[in-house]
Amino acid sequence: MTSAYELVSDYQPAGDQPQAIKTLNEGLENGLAHQTLLGVTGSGKTFTLANVIAKSGRPTVIMAHNKTLAAQLYGEMKAFFPNNAVEYFVSYFDYYQPEAYVPTTDTFIEKDSSVNEHIEQMRLSATKALLERKDAIIIASVSAIYGLGDPQAYLSMMLHLSRGDIINQRDILRRLAELQYKRNDMAFERGTFRVRGEVLDVFPAESEHEAIRIELFDDEVERISKFDPLTGSIITKDMPRCTIYPKTHYVTPREKVLDAIEQIKVDLAERKKELLANNKLVEEQRISQRTQFDIEMMNELGFCSGIENYSRYLSGRPQGEAPPTLFDYLPKDGLLIIDESHITVSQIGAMYKGDRSRKENLVEYGFRLPSALDNRPMRFDEFEARAPQTIYVSATPGKYEIEKSGSDIAEQLVRPTGLLDPIIEVRPVGTQVDDLLSEIRIRTKVGERVLVTTLTKRMSEDLTEYLAEHGVKVRYLHSDIDTVERVEIIRDLRLGKFDVLVGINLLREGLDMPEVSLVAILDADKEGFLRSERSLIQAIGRAARNLEGKAILYADRITGSMEKAIGETERRREKQILHNEALGIVPTALKKNVADILELGDMTKNKRKIVAPKMKLSEVAEEGASYQSMTPQQLEKEVQRLEAKMYQHARDLEFEQAAKVRDEVEKLRNQFITNS
């Protein structure tokens, strides 16, 4: 069977990669529900996964435990599959304050949120790709387990038009209004339509650069074409048909809304009786007033503020049933890959409990009907039941993944570059600080970097101060530092602006720094979460991308976790040495551009190239640097400002300037994903 995917890479699988790819693909073909890819740091796990996806030819969801890792994966997969649908599905809130009630102070906090339009467009594009294409790869965060609109209602609301259809223009306009598109004959933006005589232009909600033009002759669809909404130039002429998707995942047919209102009225009457029976008069009045207002809004407008709390009625689900999520859009033969599974799996399980306790307060005190409890993320058992065939990916898989996979674990211990796992030394705690200082001096002389991990914030601060007093260029990475600043600190370490980075639990997953040749773990014998076998292996792995990689564990005794971590690292190192000797491989240093950790690859590869006037290199560099230091909120404001400028240029028929500004907006949007 020919795969729908086209993998583009200058490399061929090497080291343990061919065997891992073969094992995982055979497992998928044999119908294995759970497999694990145990891949050491720097062994090219992403490339292995790209090969597995390409060979299997299945639509795939890759889940990451945070937006930073999701953005990194998105960039890498975009580079591997430039001609396929690689999409990004993370939470679209720039800011989110859920509604809550604090009984002790009698304080009700209204829901407040700010939705990022670009991420919303990418989410719509992701579900569209899953519904339309076999070659869809969706990079998602844990927000994938939260409720999304019912796919059946979403599909039933789509507007299909074919050349030669007999349909009245007013009927098309009514259908577009039902899909929550707005008419705007002045500013043509995403999620709007405009009418000029018998020509109807629609800017689809999931599209970035393409709009649809429907030309009618009387009541017949005469021509359908695709055009650039900015310049007006035709992209595809005379299309046989087109499909317009709803503006939001939560769109619902009018009949369903009316049915839901009737059911809400019945449940409201029951809840009022219940509250009165318990002598809760204030709560009874509160639930009555709030729900009646919502019913009125739904009746008049088709939606209301907080309509997600009535999602059970709108999707026709029985009480307690799991909400529809991204997994309901994934075809039956879909594939799920969970990256850094030892963290992501536990995150999936934790989401439900926190949401539940907040909602129970709202229901108990009459702010919401009990149906609000069904607007929630999936429980872990529901996630397990809905998840398709799954591959867990980690250098240190958790108990859950190992139990589920059993013997179906593909090991990727050998790196294509021949690099070995670090040498591990155990040294006494008594002299750890002075010993560390002398080790730092040895490394900095040859231009290498050092990571130091401590147990407490206080110790990190004191150590940073001590090292700085002794002339070491050192920085401290702590939990108060936001994602953007964190990325900048890592970049500065790689560039050599400082030599030593001190932290607590921040030097683990997803940090690729080939310049780091030494990882020092202070108080390694203090058994606990930060010094568990998994944490130690992850920290040791940070030195695995350097030819001179070494890890020093400062401890007065060997704990169980240390013994396991040292044993596992030595087992891997032994296998790597044997492999190198057998094939005559000489380990080579990993070359990774410093820019790689800040950029998402060429996301605009397949988009129109517009030649802009030459700029001075210094100007370009300054511009890029200023974008990197912006917060997501600042970037969003800048995008809005530039978009307004772009549309003004288009209205003034200055298409070259408009296209130039559009390229700038594209850069900002890519940076937004990294910075968020």
Curated annotation (Swiss-Prot):
Disulfide bonds: none annotated. The keyword ATP-binding applies. Pfam families: Helicase_C (PF00271), ResIII (PF04851), UVR (PF02151), UvrB (PF12344), UvrB_inter (PF17757). It is found in: Cytoplasm. SMART domains: DEXDc (SM00487), HELICc (SM00490). CDD domains: DEXHc_UvrB (cd17916), SF2_C_UvrB (cd18790). One of its GO terms (molecular function) is DNA binding. Residues 636-671 form the UVR domain. PROSITE patterns: HELICASE_ATP_BIND_1, HELICASE_CTER, UVR. Keywords: ATP-binding, Cytoplasm, DNA damage, DNA excision, DNA repair, Excision nuclease, Helicase, Hydrolase, Nucleotide-binding, SOS response. A motif (Beta-hairpin) lies at residues 92-115. Residues 26-183 form the Helicase ATP-binding domain. InterPro entries: Helicase/UvrB_N (IPR006935), Helicase_ATP-bd (IPR014001), Helicase_C-like (IPR001650), P-loop_NTPase (IPR027417), UVR_dom (IPR001943), UVR_dom_sf (IPR036876), UvrB (IPR004807), UvrB_inter (IPR041471). One of its GO terms (biological process) is SOS response. GO terms for cellular component: cytoplasm; excinuclease repair complex. Residues 432-594 form the Helicase C-terminal domain. ATP binds at G39, V40, T41, G42, S43, G44, K45, T46. Belongs to the UvrB family. The beta-hairpin motif is involved in DNA binding. Forms a heterotetramer with UvrA during the search for lesions. Interacts with UvrC in an incision complex. The UvrABC repair system catalyzes the recognition and processing of DNA lesions. A damage recognition complex composed of 2 UvrA and 2 UvrB subunits scans DNA for abnormalities. Upon binding of the UvrA(2)B(2) complex to a putative damaged site, the DNA wraps around one UvrB monomer. DNA wrap is dependent on ATP binding by UvrB and probably causes local melting of the DNA helix, facilitating insertion of UvrB beta-hairpin between the DNA strands. Then UvrB probes one DNA strand for the presence of a lesion. This is UvrABC system protein B.
